[in-house]
UniProtKB/Swiss-Prot annotation:
The keyword Cell membrane applies. Residues 302-314 have a biased composition (Basic and acidic residues). It comes from Rattus norvegicus (Rat). The gene is Ffar2. Interacts with FCN1 (via Fibrinogen C-terminal domain). This is Free fatty acid receptor 2.
Amino acid sequence: MTPDWHSSLILTAYILIFLTGLPANLLALRAFVSRVRQPQPAPVHILLLNLTLADLLLLLLLPFRIVEAASNFRWYLPKIVCALTGFGFYSSIYCSTWLLAGISIERYLGVAFPVQYKLSRRPLYGVIAALVAWIMSFGHCTIVIIVQYLNSTEQVGTENQITCYENFTQAQLDVVLPVRLELCLVLFFVPMTVTIFCYWRFVWIMLTQPHVGAQRRRRAVGLAVVTLLNFLVCFGPYNMSHLVGFHLRQSPSWRVEAVVFSSLNASLDPLLFYFSSSVVRRAFGKGLLLLRNPGSSMLGRGAEETVEGTKTDRGGSQTEGAQSSDFVTE
């Protein structure tokens, strides 16, 4: 079946997100895994690693969306595949919102209370925060999947064509729409509010401290801007569809396009990784060099780069006031 122009646009967007997001997140994954394996990793690196895993989960499920768009949003796979891919896809989105909030809290505490934070922080705190984000997203999305699985695929029209998560009876909407509203409030507006407050204070401190260099200030502003774009551009339209749907008592017609914007998060997060960690900046630099010189071996130099990156992180962090943080003021 040849996709129409609307499906073709969405198909193109999904393919571009997949092609740009997958290699960038794999590079970031390699960098964060090597960093977390070192003794006493910083909580922020644990959170960034989990954010990378959430992005990769979304990207690995994106081919199902690509196939669906190529089929004019007709679902030809088994019913359970629709339920499981939807569960994983939306869980990764909502896990990302709270992980972003956790990263913003870590950044704010690191610059507002550098000495106290350096003395009190533990890797366990990052693990606990990441687990809470995953449990909250999986738990909430499980509720939606249980409701939607009763109608995860439905016959539409007169040609026995099947769609995935698009058609619901009014009785099902009476359950689904309030749950979506709760998702929007708890897993979007609350973490976005926390993130905006933390980055507002974070950027203000970085810009008003006279001993903070211009490069660190630019990275601080870039980190805040990319995170804000994530919430407003990527997650915003999809969650606004929850509010509009609850008001109209039906899913809005533009919900499919909103889901595409939420997928864009997987391509935007690598920019956040770039501003957040010198390990990732070096990994991206090495990756660009490898693209220019295909004959060189990334794997062959992986261990050497990891050791070098770890030493640089530690040295730079100790100078700035806390291990493994690019933004801790003295």
